[in-house]
Amino acid sequence: MTNYAIILAAGKGTRMTSDLPKVLHKVSGLTMLEHVFRSVKAISPEKSVTVIGHKSEMVRAVLADQSAFVHQTEQLGTGHAVMMAETQLEGLEGHTLVIAGDTPLITGESLKSLIDFHVNHKNVATILTATAPDPFGYGRIVRNKDGEVIKIVEQKDANEYEQQLKEINTGTYVFDNKRLFEALKCITTNNAQGEYYLTDVVAIFRANKEKVGAYILRDFNESLGVNDRVALATAETVMRQRITQKHMVNGVTFQNPETVYIESDVEIAPDVLIEGNVTLKGRTHIGSGTVLTNGTYIVDSEIGQGSIITNSMIESSVLAAGVTVGPYAHLRPGTTLDREVHIGNFVEVKDSHIGEKTKAGHLTYIGNAQVGSSVNVGAGTITVNYDGQNKYETVIGDHAFIGSNSTLIAPLEVGDNALTAAGSTISKTVPADSIVIGRSRQVTKEGYAKRLAHHPSRSK
């Protein structure tokens, strides 16, 4: 059995009120088009054809070489859009799935079941339908007394009886590929919209006594077509519930799943504890036994097992096992933390590698640095890495002790086991096993405070 797919992605999406093409709006971190394309892969199509139109280059860039593309210059209806794909699929034997690119909730399992139903019933066309609580706006499925599908009626063309029908057309179909394009040559624009309706091919098949069937979705949510921001928010809510439920089934604990945002490509190992208001985005991986506390935000990062992240932001970073971060820390892109590193409150790290068991507990900036293992970085330490034009590197050796309020002016190297005195400004190499003091000598002038205007003795 050979399958093909046509994805309709040419529309502008006027009701979205956006410069972005409708199918490129995101749901849980992926564009709607990407969600649809991933689900389509479940039927293993020999060839996928995406129909593009409005801002076509932007849409094409999302799928790149994963799909063939055809251009619909004028948007003259769904039937017209499918006609554009004939140049890619003409004369091929097999079954063609037609699906809209704005249906992000459709699952691969449902599409696979649709194809199987179509093949097993030897249909020339199969419509994916659903039972809608409120069918207004949808095309209605009209059946005869034997339950056979005889036609699909659009909302604007439906009579009073047809408008009461609850079974709706989801806009997804499977056709015999050759018969699809033969039938499309017979449809017209004689309807309320003045467009070529893809649904008109059903009546053509019925007139020829060819078999048309309908496969009913189990979950109405999968039928959602996103036409405005309200529907986009609905899709986001449903997708978020799916994602959190999937992780819970796989052994992840959520204290308040309704407040958590996790994108589609995030991976979470078992026995992770996630508190409320946590955000996980991009290609993030969370290792087993890790705890993410309230307010943590992580994007495109790897967190090792048994780590504890407390109310902190982590971007494009790699953390080994047993790391503790926060509260209120910020790990910026390019950060690597080895095992059992501790990054404490109000510490910022950027584009730096920090060795095992090193600690930076408070109020510190580490940028463009290579820090060894078992280093203590005192509170208030700053790596001065930028001169206004270029960034420079700081290298700190193993077991070094950086005193509080040290200012390390890069490029700089501090050797193994070296110590910088608190309050020092260091601008030259510190050899291994050295102590460096880079501050002015304290001068004490006894009794001088009595000369100051605010001294208590002056108010008498």
UniProtKB/Swiss-Prot annotation:
Acetyl-CoA binds at A379, N385, Y386, S404, A422, R439. UDP-N-acetyl-alpha-D-glucosamine binds at residues 8-11, 22, 72, 77-78, 139, 154, 169, 227, 332, 350, 365, 376. Residues 251-460 are annotated as: N-acetyltransferase. GO terms for cellular component: cytoplasm; membrane. One of its GO terms (molecular function) is magnesium ion binding. Its main location: cytoplasm. Its EC number is 2.7.7.23, 2.3.1.157. Catalyzes the last two sequential reactions in the de novo biosynthetic pathway for UDP-N-acetylglucosamine (UDP-GlcNAc). The C-terminal domain catalyzes the transfer of acetyl group from acetyl coenzyme A to glucosamine-1-phosphate (GlcN-1-P) to produce N-acetylglucosamine-1-phosphate (GlcNAc-1-P), which is converted into UDP-GlcNAc by the transfer of uridine 5-monophosphate (from uridine 5-triphosphate), a reaction catalyzed by the N-terminal domain. HAMAP family: GlmU (MF_01631). The lineage of its organism: Bacteria, Bacillati, Bacillota, Bacilli, Lactobacillales. Binds 1 Mg(2+) ion per subunit. Mg(2+) binds at D102, N227. This is Bifunctional protein GlmU. Keywords: Acyltransferase, Cell shape, Cell wall biogenesis/degradation, Cytoplasm, Magnesium, Metal-binding, Multifunctional enzyme, Nucleotidyltransferase, Peptidoglycan synthesis, Repeat, Transferase.
